[in-house]
């Protein structure tokens, strides 16, 4: 095994700079294959790499080859299988488990022991040894001894050093010079000893010969040391001299440092003083303006504004650390605070006086607007107050409590002022709308009957308001009283819903203009006030309130909440919300007054809701385009809901009145009242809603109304006793069709076609029903002829039937001479004239249809005679031309 180890070292490991430490002859467990060797090696160069190498003998058996190598650090477990009994098997756990069988247990133990020592030395006990004897691993040996053992092993490994080529060559030369070296080793050793003695003697003589030179060298060294001592003495003297100079230089340096430090401190102190003087010194002119400056003139306001800005800058200056500890700074800050408080009180007091004065000045102008439908102009007041806008901004940032108090006072004064102005404005609008004067208000104190008489008396003297009639009285109308369907109302104070038919176009146009004038006056008033509030109270620049707001009192003295007109408290989260809340409080009377005006307009004429819906929708749309969340947009939107509700109520009332309408049992029906009402409504609506934004609402109303008209026309026609059902249906649907054709309402195209179809169907039905059988006996005769033909008798053979021969035919024809026919047609014309109404003018249409139907029957009889009685020469005693002449003369005679 030693020879194999030396061979492997020489052939495989030495070329790779490796040393072989241990070797074991193994084969794989369970397989009968050639043996191989597992070798434990280390590299000769650092860092040391430890490997386990598998070496296999070549197939020819003359040399070894390296098959595979594993780094020892990759070895996880060494399993000896049995720690007590001798067992040549062992496992090495690399990336997978390798099972080996050693040629002997001793070789296995020696190899495992080597692996253990390498693990102790290079891997810091990383490998786990399983089923290995404790004696083998030297666990009983202390750590120090273990290290010595490991070191000894390394030394044992180092005992063997292979000769290099030069050493081998020298040994060979020496041995060639001594032939006896091999035959007589003792002689060779003795020779070597003698040569060694000769060499030692030569070395001693050489040393003794160099003694003189050594003495000379020692003498030179002594002289050099003496020179060095002298130089050191001179250097010491120089050092003492330099030490005094160093002390003087240190003193000068320290003095310069102190001078520089003093200068630096002086510069910094001057800078701090200049900073405080420049930033915390308020000019005397500013102080005077704050204490007693004029707050009336523009120049005085400008001076106060500049002084307030300068004061704010001085108070808001960012002091450097330590400044607030200075007594002068504290005194100056206290002086600034006193100036701020004093000026804030002066400013708040002055502005409160301005608000009060404005209320008195505006009140004096109310009389001028009491007879005109205009609102007083607040622009001069806004213009004067806007001069204080910058001061209000200053007050807001410095003393929010006084700022909020001014806001509350402004809202209180202005809300009362606007309430008076707006109520007077709406009173004028109501008077112009109803055509009354202020004196009519005193009628409210009169008894109901006396008030009604007074109102009727005024209407007889030319009052422009025609407040008569009630749409709720349709159920009391008769066809005969269609010219005067409505009863007069008792008074303005007790008005019901007015009928649109009693108000002419001029009255409705007047209402439209008044309502538009009201909205046109309110809109700029609200926008101007909102713009003024935004600019004067500086609420448009920041979205969030300052932190100080939460500490200030609100407009009502509590937390920062605003109360809507509905009574609920709303938190103000932004300045935009605050503007809206201020507008709500200032103009809290606008929405109720608008609703009252709308209610009055609806009472005067329910059709006024059409005008109001269009106008209000347009103004809401305009306001929302400017600011959807503004007070004006919200208020008009709420009022629009009321207007839309009134519009829907108007439609519902019309449908209800259709259902409640009653007709006279003694007179002909004619055009039903609600059909005429629908025509009036549609014509008015089309003129109002032309290019309007709410066209969709009108289309929905059209659909509801037309369905109600169709249903109730049929209902009335079924209940009619005096007028035939077909006449009622024909006349009313003809009127509806004519109305829809004239107005060209796109959403009612299907209903227009339906009305035309119903008119046509009932016209045909009425013609057939009224015409009946004018030639009754002749008609019965030919019905019998047609019955025989239907039974299978040929037409030309019918004349051979006893009851239908030529003689019977001539007998029947003689009973209807032209004179009798004309008399029958004349009676029919009178009957139709009695059924039809003059309003629709359908008499000639119906008469022409009857003429066509009579001619059709005549032609039918002529055809039967020609087919069933060919060559008989039998003909009617009157011709088609006679029929045309009869009908024409009858129509002209009436």
From Swiss-Prot:
Localisation per UniProt entry: Midbody, Midbody ring; Cytoplasm; Cytoplasm, Perinuclear region; Cell membrane
GO biological process, one term: mitotic cytokinesis
GO cellular component, one term: Flemming body
Pfam family, one: Sec3-PIP2_bind
Disordered: annotated span: 437-495
Compositionally biased spans, kind Low complexity: 460-491
Keywords: Cell membrane, Coiled coil, Cytoplasm, Exocytosis, Membrane, Phosphoprotein, Protein transport, Transport
Modification Phosphoserine, positions: 470, 473, 487, 501
Coiled coil: 152-199, 205-259
InterPro entries, per the entry: Sec3-PIP2_bind, Sec3_C, Sec3_CC
Basic and acidic residues bias spans: 438-459
Residue(s) carrying Phosphothreonine: 471
Major localisation: other
Positions of transmembrane segments: none
Reported function: Component of the exocyst complex involved in the docking of exocytic vesicles with fusion sites on the plasma membrane.
Family: Belongs to the SEC3 family.
Quaternary data: The exocyst complex is composed of EXOC1, EXOC2, EXOC3, EXOC4, EXOC5, EXOC6, EXOC7 and EXOC8. Interacts with EEF1A1. Interacts with SLC6A9; interaction increases the transporter capacity of SLC6A9 probably by promoting its insertion into the cell membrane.
The protein, known as: Exocyst complex component 1
